[in-house]
């Protein structure tokens, strides 16, 4: 299965009548492996900050997480594995695998839990595949 198929079929899938606003699979260096049409472009320093938070959980909490210059308040995640952020009525979930970052961005009416489920399910699958 291509990386684009993972995005199209597993991240942008319908969950209880709702979809993520955008999604992508990135390399740890920020290289885009596949993305949805509306996925924002990360800046290199944003990827650096995200990767540092995986290595040093809590790094982003004081300043927030920036994605394409949009600021997200970092909320409870799983240290070293998942970063979650909130911005207004929407948010973001980032799951780290051995080689990739699985990213989902949502807006209402999708819930944080639905976003977490979609992103983390694919991330867990990729981890089991050694990716």
Swiss-Prot record:
Enumerate the subcellular locations listed in this protein's record, separating them with semicolons: Cytoplasm, Cytoskeleton
* InterPro entries linked to this entry: PFN, PFN_euk, PFN_sf, Profilin_CS
User: What Gene3D superfamilies does this protein's entry cite?
Assistant: Dynein light chain 2a, cytoplasmic
| One CC-aspect GO term | cell cortex
Q: Which Pfam families match?
A: Profilin
Q: Which UniProt keywords apply?
A: Actin-binding, Allergen, Cytoplasm, Cytoskeleton, Disulfide bond, Phosphoprotein
A GO molecular function assigned to this protein is: actin monomer binding
Q: Which residues carry this modification: Phosphothreonine?
A: 111
Query: What stretch of residues is annotated with the motif Involved in PIP2 interaction?
Result: 81-97
State the oligomer form and interacting partners: Occurs in many kinds of cells as a complex with monomeric actin in a 1:1 ratio.
- Give additional notes from the record: The variability of the residues taking part of IgE-binding epitopes might be responsible of the difference in cross-reactivity among olive pollen cultivars, and between distantly related pollen species, leading to a variable range of allergy reactions among atopic patients.
Q: Provide the function of this protein.
A: Binds to actin and affects the structure of the cytoskeleton. At high concentrations, profilin prevents the polymerization of actin, whereas it enhances it at low concentrations.
Question: What is the recorded name of this protein?
Answer: Profilin-8
* Organism for this UniProt entry: Phleum pratense
Classification from the root reads: Eukaryota, Viridiplantae, Streptophyta, Embryophyta, Tracheophyta
């Amino acid at each position: 299965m291509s990386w684009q198929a993972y995005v199209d079929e597993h991240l942008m899938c319908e969950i209880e009548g709702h979809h993520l606003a955008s999604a992508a699979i990135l390399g740890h260096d920020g290289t885009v492996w596949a993305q949805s049409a509306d996925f924002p472009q990360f800046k290199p320093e944003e990827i650096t900050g995200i990767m540092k938070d995986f290595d040093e959980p809590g790094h982003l909490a004081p300043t927030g997480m920036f994605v394409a210059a949009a600021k997200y308040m970092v909320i409870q995640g799983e240290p070293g594995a998942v970063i979650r952020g909130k911005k207004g009525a929407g948010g973001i979930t980032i799951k780290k695998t051995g080689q990739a970052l699985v990213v989902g961005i949502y807006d209402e009416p999708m819930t944080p839990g639905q976003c977490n489920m979609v992103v983390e399910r694919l991330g867990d699958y990729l981890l089991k595949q050694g990716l």
